[in-house]
């Protein structure tokens, strides 16, 4: 049974990927395993109580397992309980790739769209910078997630998030023609590109040392600066300063990691579009895991709010 199809208090069984497995202890000092399971429809947490040494050795992150259990809701959070686990037998599903959440849009379609939109960057300085960095990180950009957790945290999530933002910018610029389309496109295409440096990759994603210590905003600004030097572009040109500005401030507030606040329209719009797409993905992901008439689990990145799934046709 798919995770997104599980109903409250329903017994289920099926094959799932262990996304994470943490060994913990109860107050009484007994071992238990805290899991996050996933399939291509979503994720759900569960615990294996009184974990024995052979359980701890066998059920590790990255492995596919057969699981029986009951889907429950605790503190508005869906979870699986009363679980029994075993490893797959010969002939049963065991390829982790089959259990990963995938982009709703095929990566080839995303690649074709992004290539098309790069041509629409009319400013030659911005287009050269974008082309250079997209060539440098082509493989990583079209495979990495956009985050370890929260929004677009799946393989190709980075490219899907970026392409969706470009689509939104394209539509918004028709309503507000005073916006510079080329700056919007270039800024969006580069704003999260350094996630390919900040994160380890699409499998069991973690932060790299540079990701932990510097973060993707500082990393992409450094990449742009190096690219400008390599291309022989004057780094004091207004185009370079504006491009760096819209990227440095795309988190909006200083407390969210941006070193400066937005000072031009395009910077403000990119921040809003980024927040819109991230919020929609987080809400949609959480709502897919609950039934109509239920609340989602609390979403930490959205002020720890729960969201209601209307009981409507």
Q: What spans do the regions from the language model cover?
A:
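Acidic/His-rich, divalent-metal-binding segments that scaffold phosphate/diphosphate chemistry
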Residues: 92-213, 237
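Structural detector for short beta-strands of small beta-barrel domains
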Residues: 10-27
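N-terminal intrinsically disordered, cationic/polar leader segments
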Residues: 68, 271, 288-289, 293-313
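Divalent metal-coordination and catalytic microenvironments
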Residues: 16, 62, 165, 274
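Short, acidic/hydrophobic/Gly-rich beta-strand patch recurrent on exposed beta strands
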Residues: 34-39
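OB-fold single-stranded nucleic acid-binding module
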Residues: 22-31, 44-45, 51-97
């Amino acid at each position: 049974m798919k995770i997104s199809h599980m109903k409250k208090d329903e017994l289920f069984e099926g094959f799932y990927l262990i996304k994470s497995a943490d060994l913990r202890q109860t107050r009484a000092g007994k071992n238990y395993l805290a899991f996050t399971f996933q399939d291509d429809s979503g994720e759900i947490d569960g615990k294996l109580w009184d974990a024995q040494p052979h359980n701890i050795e066998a059920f590790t992150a990255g492995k596919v397992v057969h699981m029986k259990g009951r889907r429950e809701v605790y503190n508005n959070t869906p979870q699986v309980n009363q679980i029994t686990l075993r490893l797959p037998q010969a002939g049963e599903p065991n390829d982790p790739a089959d259990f990963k959440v995938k982009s709703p849009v095929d990566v080839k379609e995303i690649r074709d769209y992004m290539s098309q939109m790069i041509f629409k960057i009319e400013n030659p300085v911005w287009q050269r910078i974008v082309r250079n960095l997209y060539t440098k990180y082509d493989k990583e950009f079209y495979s990495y997630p956009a985050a370890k957790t929260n929004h677009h945290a799946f393989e190709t999530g980075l490219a899907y998030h970026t392409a969706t933002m470009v689509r939104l910018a394209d539509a918004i610029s028709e309503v507000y023609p005073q916006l510079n389309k080329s700056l919007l496109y270039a800024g969006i295409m580069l704003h999260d590109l350094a996630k390919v440096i900040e994160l380890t990759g699409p499998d069991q994603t973690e932060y790299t040392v540079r990701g932990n210590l510097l973060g993707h905003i500082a990393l992409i600004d450094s990449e742009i600066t190096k690219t400008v030097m390599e291309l022989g572009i004057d780094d004091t040109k207004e185009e370079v300063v504006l491009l760096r500005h819209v990227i440095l401030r795309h988190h909006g507030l200083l407390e969210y990691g941006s070193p400066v606040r937005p000072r031009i329209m395009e910077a403000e719009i990119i921040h809003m579009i980024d927040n819109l797409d991230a919020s929609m993905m987080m809400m949609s992901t959480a709502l897919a895991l609950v039934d109509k008439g239920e609340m989602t689990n609390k979403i930490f990145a959205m002020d720890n709010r729960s969201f209601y799934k209307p009981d409507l046709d």
